Amino acid sequence: MLGFKKTYSLPFKFEIPNYTQEFLAKRSLFKSLFKYIKRCLYIFLKGQRSLETLKILDEHHKILWINFSAPSIGDSLMDLSSRVLLSDKKIDLLTDKKNKHLYKDDNIFSSVYSKIDDVVENYYDLAIVDSYSTRSINIKHQVMPLAPFLGIYGHYNGPEVNRVLYSFHRLNSLL
C-alpha cells in the first residue's frame, strides 16, 4: 500500500536512537497494515485528507496543538518539548486533563484546554495533532473541521524512539 513505509520510517533526514529493526522483526504485518488502512480511511471519511499540510507557513499565526495520543506525563513533556521552536506563533494546547496543570503557566502556550467544548469557539489557522490516531483526528474534526492540519508523529506508529529528539527534528522539518 502506498505510504505504508511512513508507519515505521522517520519523517526527517536525521538519525535518532530508535528500535525500528526490533519493531519490524516482532510486529504483525497484517495488524500494522490494517491499522494504517483504518487510519487513512478515517481521515478520508472525516473529510480531512485534503486538509493535511506538510509545512507550518508564515500565515499560520494561531495554532492549536492537540496532544492526546500519549497521555502519560513523561510522553507529553517529551512530545511537546519542541514547542519552543514556535515562540513566534500564538499556540494553544488541548491536552489530557491530567496534564493540563503542567502547561498552565507555560511561556509558549497562550491557553491550555482539556475539554473540547472550551476550544470550539476559537478560530485557528492550523492544527498540530500528535498522531493520526482516530482519536486525534476525531478531536481535530470536532474542533476545527475545515482548517489545515499536520502531524508530529503522523502515521509513524510502533517503533520506540527518543521522543525529545524526534519532536525537535520533526517540528524543525515542518518549519
Where are these regions (language model features)?
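Catalytic machinery of carbohydrate-active enzymes
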Residues: 1-175
